[in-house]
Regions:
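Short cysteine-rich clusters marking metal-coordination/redox-active sites
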Residues: 60-63, 88-91
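Cys/His-rich microdomains that often coordinate metals
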Residues: 66-69, 94-95
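Short, intrinsically disordered terminal segments enriched in charged and Pro/Gly residues
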Residues: 1-50, 101-148, 204-205, 209-210
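Membrane-interface, cytosolic juxtamembrane amphipathic helix immediately N-terminal to a transmembrane helix
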Residues: 91-101
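Sequence context of c-type cytochrome heme-c attachment sites
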Residues: 48, 70-72
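Short, flexible, mixed-charge glycine/proline-rich loop motifs
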Residues: 47-57, 77-83
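Short linker/helix segments within small regulatory modules
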Residues: 74-85, 99-104
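Juxtamembrane/disordered regions of integral membrane proteins
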Residues: 137-212
Length: 212
């Protein structure tokens, strides 16, 4: 698909935020267990004065429709369980998604276990998707970082990331009871979490410009 670069900012793996999603090992949990995915290509309307959340779009390469980015959200119950990609409610195809590097490594190593039933699992997954998108509402979705929401979201991110590191560290031989690890995890929760939340608040409250 071709996009008007004067109208849209195009997000691919080359964008630093998307690259963070690919390289952050903690996000493998989101993909493998929760089924949270992000598309290979997403768009931001630079000409709209609306907040970022309301001017982000996901293009379907199959039917070429631009979906409102809020189509896949926790409020609609569609943010998770997208293990095989993002389902397009318009044409019924699957919008290609990026994959976290750690997720890729885990899937490669465990392929002999799940490879046998991948095709049948995907078919069952596809059959369940139309019902999930029958009554979605995008206009009612609010920015979770709005007001003081960034504090809650920030601490939530810090706590979840710390828990994932507590699982990951022993695997690579790091003592989770060492002073250095404890200080690191507390800093991640008390400093990194709120900082992450505030940065996301600023990002989601950005508006475009009609002059763009």
């Amino acid at each position: 698909m071709n996009f008007d670069k004067n109208k849209y900012k195009i997000y691919t793996w080359k964008n630093w935020m998307v690259l963070h999603y690919i390289l952050n090992p903690g996000l493998a949990f989101n993909e493998l267990i929760l089924g949270q995915r992000i598309p290979k290509v997403s768009l931001e309307d630079k000409t709209s004065e609306k907040p970022f959340l309301e001017r982000s779009y996901v293009p379907c390469p199959h039917c070429e429709i631009l979906h409102d980015g809020r189509t896949w959200s926790t409020q609609n119950g569609t943010a998770f369980r997208n293990w095989f990609g993002l389902y397009c409610p318009n044409c019924g195809e699957v919008i290609p998604c990026l994959m976290n590097l750690t997720t890729s490594l885990i899937l490669i190593i465990t392929f002999p276990v799940w490879g046998w039933f991948k095709k049948s699992s995907k078919q069952r997954w596809l059959e369940k998707q139309p019902a999930r998108y029958k009554e979605i509402e995008v206009d009612q979705i609010e920015n979770p970082f709005e007001g003081y929401g960034w504090i809650k979201e920030g601490f939530g991110w810090g706590i979840l990331t710390s828990l994932l590191l507590l699982i990951f560290f022993p695997i690579i031989g790091i003592d989770i009871f060492s002073r250095q690890v404890i200080v690191t995890l507390l800093s991640l929760i008390l400093v990194g979490g709120p900082l992450f939340g505030f940065i996301m608040k600023l990002f989601f409250e950005q508006t475009g410009s009609k002059a763009a």
